[in-house]
């Protein structure tokens, strides 16, 4: 005997019937998902439209990350000190602390 299992998504907002889509949104660093009918999804987007228009976009859709995600690779204290010393001797303006600009690091690697 065969069984058929059907999963029906119900509108999370008002429970009025089947949800047509899952909407993802974020607030205060927390991402939410809500299953909504087309009508309620349109209403949510309309309600948020004025806030979205006044805000700044800080990211897009998530993508899978490859590798360690550390970019060019971390540099240790000794290497950082050597790069800063080389940069000062060669006319680059670098701070005593903090991030070393990528162009300075590239110039250091090209020269050494």
Curated annotation (Swiss-Prot):
GO biological process, one term: cellular response to oxygen levels
Pfam short name (any one): Lsr2
GO molecular function: acyltransferase activity; DNA binding
Annotated region of DNA binding: 97-102
Record's subcellular location: Cytoplasm, Nucleoid
InterPro entries linked to this entry: E3-bd_dom_sf (IPR036625), Lsr2-like_dimerization (IPR042261), Lsr2_dim_dom (IPR024412), Lsr2_DNA-bd (IPR055370)
Keyword Endoplasmic reticulum attached: no
Region (Disordered): 57-79
GO cellular component, one term: cytosol
Transmembrane segments: none
Effect of loss of the gene: No visible effect on nucleoid structure during anaerobic growth by whole cell staining. Sensitive to atmospheric O(2) levels, at 2% O(2) no difference in growth up to 14 days; required for adaptation to anaerobiosis, at 21 days nearly 1000-fold decrease in survival under anaerobic conditions. Consumes O(2) more rapidly. Has a significant lag in recovery from 7 or 14 days anaerobic growth. Decreased virulence in lungs of BALB/c mice; no visible lung disease at any time point. Increased sensitivity to reactive nitrogen species, not more sensitive to H(2)O(2) or mitomycin.
PTM remark: The three N-terminal residues may be cleaved by proteases in response to external stress. This cleavage may be required for oligomerization, which leads to chromosome compaction and protection.
Keywords: Cytoplasm, DNA-binding, Repressor, Transcription, Transcription regulation, Virulence
Subunit structure: Homodimer. May form higher oligomers via protease-activation.
Biological role stated in the UniProt entry: DNA-bridging protein that has both architectural and regulatory roles. Influences the organization of chromatin and gene expression by binding non-specifically to DNA, with a preference for AT-rich sequences, and bridging distant DNA segments. Binds in the minor groove of AT-rich DNA. Represses expression of multiple genes involved in a broad range of cellular processes, including major virulence factors or antibiotic-induced genes, such as iniBAC or efpA, and genes important for adaptation of changing O(2) levels. May also activate expression of some gene.
This protein's domain notes: The C-terminal domain binds DNA and the N-terminal domain is involved in dimerization. Both domains are essential for normal function.
Family membership: Belongs to the Lsr2 family.
Name of the protein described by the UniProt record: Nucleoid-associated protein Lsr2
Protein's organism: Mycobacterium tuberculosis (strain ATCC 25618 / H37Rv)
Organism ancestry: Bacteria, Bacillati, Actinomycetota, Actinomycetes, Mycobacteriales
């Amino acid at each position: 005997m065969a069984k058929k299992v059907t999963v029906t998504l119900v509108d999370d907002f008002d429970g009025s019937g089947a949800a047509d889509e899952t909407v993802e949104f974020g607030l205060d660093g927390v991402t939410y998902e809500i299953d909504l009918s087309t009508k309620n999804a349109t209403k949510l987007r309309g309600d948020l439209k004025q806030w979205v228009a006044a805000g700044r976009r800080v990211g897009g859709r998530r993508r899978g990350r490859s590798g360690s995600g550390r970019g060019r690779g971390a540099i240790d204290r000794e290497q950082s000190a050597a790069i800063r010393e080389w940069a000062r001797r060669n006319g680059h303006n670098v701070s005593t602390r903090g991030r070393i600009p990528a162009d300075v690091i590239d110039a250091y690697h090209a020269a050494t």
